[in-house]
Swiss-Prot record:
HAMAP family: tRNA_methyltr_TrmB (MF_01057)
Pfam families: Methyltransf_4 (PF02390)
Protein name as it appears in the record: tRNA (guanine-N(7)-)-methyltransferase
Gene Ontology terms for molecular function: tRNA (guanine(46)-N7)-methyltransferase activity
Length: 245
């Protein structure tokens, strides 16, 4: 029986540094792939519910649904997918695409979505930035970023998803009136997010400039959120609406 080797933190740090030093590594990514074994149900789910898994490149995400005219929500980094599945169950009038690079998370998400018989959820193993670039402008109703890697070390700040360059791309793809919803339990990243987002002229802070949004009841609690609460961390939600181009 083969065993999947899981990288230590030190090994990940070394890999990140080596990637940054490669001359051909021009694109800064916001994620690192981490290996982990699949359980039996996850392995079978990848085959049984493969119709829920999109293969990159995918083009316009809306075309992969039975009702492409329904509002589209894109979640970037859905972890194990429980909250994404719950949202798709609660909102059959919307289409959901989850983008994740952690294979066990993808497998668990399609297992739960498949068992629930969901038709309005698809998942994708890809770099979210590349996926967004290939989407038509003004085509997404909501982009969700829940408890992303805060990249705590200063030299890794460029990897944070919420920076001006990446938010410009998000704005281009959001339809007018569409929203960007982020949540984090890491206070320094929350302050960073607010500083970036409050200074985007095309976005309006629905909680008022300088404020975080009251925790929405409709956002299911995630595993990372529970861990943050158990550690005594404050949970910050930010919802920004596109008001211009």
């Amino acid at each position: 029986m083969s065993h999947t080797k899981i990288m230590s933190t030190d090994q990940l740090e070394t890999q990140i540094t080596e990637l940054d030093n490669l001359p051909e590594h021009r694109e800064i990514v916001t994620f690192m792939r981490r290996s982990a074994p699949l359980n039996t149900s996850q392995r079978s789910a990848l085959e049984q519910y493969q119709d829920l898994i999109l293969e990159y490149p995918v083009g316009d995400l809306r075309q992969h649904f039975e009702h492409p005219e329904h509002p589209l929500t894109v979640e970037i980094g859905f972890g194990m997918g429980r909250s994404l599945v719950l949202m798709a169950k609660a909102h059959p009038e919307r289409n959901f695409v989850g983008i994740e690079v952690h294979v066990p998370g993808i497998a668990q998400c399609v297992y739960e979505a498949g068992m629930a018989g969901l038709k309005n959820l698809r998942v994708l193993d890809a770099d979210a930035i590349q996926v967004l670039r290939e989407m038509p402008d003004n085509s997404i109703n909501c982009v969700q970023l829940y408890f992303p890697d805060p990249w705590q070390k200063k030299r890794h700040f460029k990897r944070r998803f919420v920076i001006h360059e990446r938010m410009q791309l998000v704005e281009q793809k959001l339809e007018l009136g569409g929203t960007f919803h982020a949540a984090t339990d890491w206070e320094p990243y929350a302050e960073w997010m607010l500083d970036v987002l409050d200074n985007r002229p095309a976005l309006e802070n629905l909680a008022g400039k300088g404020n975080s949004y009251p925790r929405p009841e409709w956002r299911p609690q995630t595993k990372f959120e529970r861990r943050g609460i158990e550690s005594g961390h404050k949970i910050n939600d930010f919802i920004f609406k596109k008001i211009g181009s």
